[in-house]
């Protein structure tokens, strides 16, 4: 996998996303097995909640993405299997339908991307929800219809009164997308992790916060790695200097105030086991946090030691150099981890949607093709567009390759 051979860019600064608690599971619907009770509220084997109200962002693919996770807890004495999830608009239109096969690709253990459509007794899984709608489609809320099954010989199966439930109903977060300048310049910048695919490392990060909620720390964060001729480094990539993005200038995405600076972490050795991760603060390595609006903070991680040019309390302007792209902290290959959060502490802040004012979509990257580079029949890993697509006010999505100007 590219995440191991290319960068293994496991999220660096575990940013945070607020959990909106939605008590209860709503109203039980017709049970799927013959003879099951159908009227009124019924007992169920599962309880469903959400990590956050759906957050909306315009993507480079021409549609808006609404992002959140459903948390499904099995309160039953035997394994439960999810069989379908439907998402509907207030007018009843079905916006997304996930059957059993589709659920297998988006249902995961709470931390990590391991598929987990079967929920063990007293266990919880997360379903990565990526609902897409046209840019001009107004949505106030999303509703969910969920079905599941248990084995016919499961113990105390008779306790289950319904195998289909409604809920939760989630209001769409009304906050507008923050429009910013890109944090880097030049072409060949790959979003090696980012929104909105379930297989993206960032999309799968879930870390409990304050013993009270499961945070979505990196929904919209991007790990930027630079490509040349479809590769991130020259030679064997054993030195940070071999990587094409190493040393790139990291820029302020808006006018703002420096609220946090961390320096002194050494460079990691690329493509080798990461060392020195003793506490949460170590993950970001050398980093900078800017406040760019009330309650909106820009987080930059993995910068080169000694390269940071700003200090806490300093006012910065859009495009100002903050430091140089490095390989410090939780990083197995030089890259910039960037995202917006709603708290100056990247460990607890909620991930916020953002978009770049002007950039160009050059193409897309294929992880499987990269891993099969030795196969003469494998397609090229990097597919460039015949005509690059100018983008205004959109988010660079997972595996997009961008010219950031």
Model-derived features: positions:
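Zn2+-dependent peptidoglycan hydrolase active-site motif and core
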Residues: 244-245, 257-304
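Acidic, glycine-rich catalytic/binding loops that coordinate metals and/or anionic ligands
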Residues: 173-192, 200-204, 212, 235, ...
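Asparagine-centered strand-capping/turn motif at beta-strand->loop junctions
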Residues: 72-79, 89
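Terminal connector regions
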Residues: 132-178
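A structural signal for short beta-strand/turn segments enriched in small hydrophobics and glycine
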Residues: 256-258, 313-325
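Intrinsically disordered, low-complexity Pro/Gly/Ser/Thr-rich segments with frequent PxxP/GP/PP motifs
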Residues: 96-138
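Short histidine-centered loop motifs in beta-beta connectors
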Residues: 251, 292, 296-319
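Short, solvent-exposed loop/turn segments enriched in Ser/Thr/Gly
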Residues: 51-52, 62-69
